[in-house]
Regions:
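N-terminal Rossmann NAD(P)H-binding glycine-rich loop of SDR-like oxidoreductase domains
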Residues: 3-25
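Conserved glycine-rich Rossmann-like NAD(P)H-binding loop of the short-chain dehydrogenase/reductase
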Residues: 26-37
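NAD(P)H-binding glycine-rich loop region in Rossmannoid oxidoreductase-like domains
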Residues: 38-95
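Conserved Rossmann-fold NAD(P)-dependent oxidoreductase catalytic core, especially the SDR/UDP-sugar
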Residues: 68-72, 84-87, 91-142, 160
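Substrate-positioning beta->alpha
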Residues: 145, 177-183, 200-225, 232-233
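Conserved beta-loop-beta element that borders a ligand/cofactor-binding pocket
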Residues: 149-177
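Glycine-rich Rossmann NAD(P)(H)-binding loop
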Residues: 169, 200-208, 235-242, 253
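Mid/C-terminal beta-alpha module of Rossmann-like enzyme folds, strongest
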Residues: 217-303, 315-317, 321, 338-345
Length: 348
């Protein structure tokens, strides 16, 4: 029997590759729920609804009775302070559950995408490599409330959660993406004849980090949601290697064709304010698609992304033991994504 996945928050970082992954298997059809839907085709059906609006969710989902798997990838709008609304995020998830549960008699599994903020990575140094059973920091965190909500409501269906770190992808439609930040920043430095300085403290340059590729995350989500041993469990999902920006920065510079610079901490969100004319010149000279720098990259996100002067590393032992053994070279992944942006005429 065909599985039917409902992806709530289908415009987010984790959802695009999940849609591709599921549709590559003829045993799946996909319902993509988003505030702004796209064109439905084949086994993909787009549904419009505001997840903050419970009655609207119920109306939009009431006729879709065949859902077997719910993948919840949505997040409430938030800034880059690291703190996100517990109330808003729990309300959105509850609205989707309230709409799906009464009509989806075949519902088997609800999967929740979380992240390393579960371990308090946004608050300061934390125990690494982070393990799924590490104690929760005693602070408000919507991940805790969402997971507890699923655990309470799971009757006749199971829940699970994935915990990626920063997600990297080729996603021209999404500015909150470290790949385009790096690419645009390097291009501007090269245009101005300036060195490719690292824009964060030395502690960040030397700390151990890991990454999560969006496609690898999608495949892991499918595995977790369909593997009996993963029922009612959470799993870290990262590429499986670790790196230091000190080692990766020269590789990026070589790929872009610029000399690596020094560690020079500054706010990228402030640095970029007068760079649009420079970017316009780059666009004209390289025949790129016309764009605004703020549409290419989220510079406030960049400040948050590189700010952590401590290790951000997660253990994948539990995921591997469950049978998902894929790994990915993070350096190669980043270079490959930059190459795809160049080929798409988004970056030079």
């Amino acid at each position: 029997m065909t599985n039917t996945a409902l992806i709530a928050g289908a415009g987010g970082a984790a959802s695009k590759r999940l849609i591709e992954t599921l549709l590559a298997d003829p045993g799946w059809s996909v319902l993509a729920l988003a505030r702004t839907p796209r064109q439905s085709a084949g086994r993909l059906t787009w549904i419009a609804a505001d997840l903050f609006d419970g009655p609207a969710c119920a109306r939009a989902l009431g006729e879709h009775r065949g859902v077997t798997h719910l993948f919840y990838t949505a997040r409430a709008k938030h800034g880059e302070t690291g703190v996100e609304s517990v109330e808003d995020n729990v309300a959105m998830l509850r609205n989707v559950l309230d709409a799906v549960e009464p009509v989806a008699a075949r519902l088997e599994h609800v999967h929740l995408v979380q992240g390393t903020k579960y371990y308090g990575m946004h608050l300061g140094p934390f125990r690494t490599p982070a393990r799924e059973d590490d104690p929760r920091p005693d602070v408000p965190n919507f991940y805790y409330d969402q997971q507890d909500l699923l655990a309470r409501r799971a009757r006749g269906w199971a829940w699970s959660a994935s915990r990626p770190t920063f997600i990297y992808d080729f996603a021209p439609e999404r500015a909150r993406n470290a790949v385009t930040v790096v690419g645009a920043y390097a291009a501007i430095c090269r245009e101005l004849g300036r060195p490719f300085d690292y824009p964060a403290p030395a502690a960040s340059f030397d700390a151990l980090r890991d990454m999560t590729d969006a496609s690898l995350l999608a495949r892991a989500m499918r595995h977790i949601a369909t593997t009996p041993a993963c029922r009612n469990e959470a799993f870290n999902v990262v590429n499986g290697d670790v790196f230091r920006w000190r080692d990766l920065w020269p590789r990026i510079a070589a790929h872009v064709g610029i000399a690596p610079g020094d560690v020079r901490p500054f706010k990228m969100s402030e640095w970029v304010r007068d760079k649009q004319p420079v970017w316009d010149g780059i666009v004209r000279r390289h025949g790129l698609a016309e764009s605004r720098l703020d549409d290419i990259a989220d510079w406030a996100f960049a400040d948050f992304h590189w700010a952590h002067g401590y290790d951000v590393v997660s253990s994948t032992a539990k995921l591997r033991e469950s049978g998902f053994t894929e790994t990915l070279d993070s350096t190669k992944m980043l270079v490959d994504h930059l190459t795809r942006y160049r080929e798409a005429k988004v970056l030079p």
